[in-house]
A protein has these predicted regions:
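Membrane-embedded alpha-helical bundles of polytopic integral membrane proteins
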Residues: 1-155
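Acidic (Asp/Glu-rich) catalytic motifs at the cytosolic membrane interface
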Residues: 92-108, 112, 121-125, 158-197
Length: 198
């Protein structure tokens, strides 16, 4: 794990796109279970391997695609890739906040009560649409037209919501409410970034 983390970001930094997109899902997922098996402790092997692979996928592989935006070569957008990264983070984080606000104000129908009891249909729809409109207004940060930015934001927000549900399912499976307590009342860093992972 401690070798794969810096290697993944090194591959991003040197802009070796074809390798950083397959390094963890192919090589990491292949060699980590082999290493675990060679260590000779078969007790809970499958459980341990699964947790390591999910940890790599979520906290390293998925997140590493955010700084990878800096390496994209977009014609007519040279030197502005940081703005694309800022756009992504603003849209995703505003979607989370706006879903919470819409849910508190108008939420009545639970969307996934066993995974995340506070999430509502009204919060989801209001938050996703509001954040997508924000993305449309922020299209000037991107190489996209206003409508392209809206559609991109809509897709980003939908995937972020689904990512949040996946992370909630993982937490419920492990019997924890939050990934940490670094941010008082809001859990850990990964709790704030779960939507960005997807």
């Amino acid at each position: 794990f401690y070798v794969i983390l810096p290697l993944q970001y090194f591959l991003v930094a040197i802009d070796w796109f074809s390798m950083f997109t397959i390094f963890i899902p192919v090589y990491g997922f292949l060699f980590l279970p082999i290493l675990s098996a060679l260590l000779g402790d078969p007790a809970h092997f499958l459980d341990r391997s699964t947790k390591i692979q999910w940890a790599l996928m979520i906290s390293v592989f998925c997140i590493s695609h955010i700084p990878a935006l800096l390496t994209l070569d977009i014609s007519g957008y040279e030197g502005k890739n940081l703005l694309l990264m800022i756009f992504l983070i603003l849209v995703v984080q505003s979607s989370d906040v706006l879903q919470y606000v819409w849910g508190k104000l108008f939420g009545e129908h639970k969307i996934a009560p066993t995974l995340s009891p506070s999430k509502t249909v009204e919060g989801f729809v209001g938050g996703v649409l509001s954040a997508s409109l924000l993305g449309m207004l922020l299209h000037w940060l991107t190489p996209f037209s206003a409508w392209q930015a809206f559609l991109m934001s809509l897709l980003i927000c939908l995937m972020g919501f689904l990512g949040g549900l996946v992370m909630s399912a993982m937490k419920r499976s492990m019997g924890v409410k939050d990934w940490g307590n670094m941010i008082s009342g809001h859990g850990g860093i990964l709790d704030r970034m779960d939507s960005l992972c997807f």
